[in-house]
Regions:
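Long, charged amphipathic helices and adjacent flexible linkers at domain junctions
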Residues: 6-42
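Conserved alpha/beta-domain cores
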Residues: 29-178
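Conformationally flexible catalytic loops at phosphate/diphosphate-handling active centers
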Residues: 1
Length: 178
């Protein structure tokens, strides 16, 4: 988020309007909690949430989500400003898995790169937008990848955890990740 000190009237009115719109939207969605999630032709859907932190699990479940479809684990890096230890990761992943239990949780392995946390990425990339990110970064830095996988495995005591590997483009990348 951002902090605006001493906003002018136009800025203040803009944020008051945004807050009002968000409140109205949240109120409309609140009326849907507990109702079946189906397409217009009656096909049932499973509604899962995408989250950035353990605190968001509770809100997702209260909103009627049937699990956590994606945990953006790279946000742990952004929040801390560094790569966390395996123990710190295990604690974070365990907190999320326990809050969601018995619902499933899908953790996406660190998807760092051009738009997010760049520590450990070479300064020159041929194509920074598509270059060394996702699984390619994790294969480039096996120490980080292995630490994260170990932490996720240690956090899986309730067996409600799934793993997503980001941006796999080739069969070779998948085989290397195994």
């Amino acid at each position: 988020g951002i902090v605006i000190v001493d906003p002018d009237n136009d800025t203040l009115n803009e944020y008051i309007k945004k807050h009002r719109q968000a409140t109205e939207y949240r109120d409309r969605l609140g009326g849907l909690v507990g109702k079946p999630t189906v397409t217009t032709d009656g096909i049932p859907l499973v509604l899962k949430a995408n989250i950035d932190s353990p605190e968001q699990v509770d809100a997702a479940i209260m909103a009627g989500c049937e699990g956590i479809g994606l945990v953006r684990t790279e946000m742990l890096l952004v929040q801390r400003g560094r790569y966390p230890s395996a123990d710190e990761q295990t604690e974070w992943y365990s907190d999320i898995a326990q809050r969601a239990y018995p619902l499933s949780v899908t953790f996406r392995a660190f998807d760092v790169g051009s738009d997010k946390f760049r520590e450990g990425i070479p300064h020159h990339e041929e194509n920074p937008a598509l270059g060394l990110r996702g699984i390619r970064f994790l294969l480039y830095r096996p120490d980080i990848f292995e630490s994260q996988i170990c932490a996720i495995l240690q956090a899986s005591v309730h067996r409600n955890i799934r793993l997503m590997l980001p941006m796999i483009a080739t069969l070779e990348e998948l085989e290397q990740a195994k």
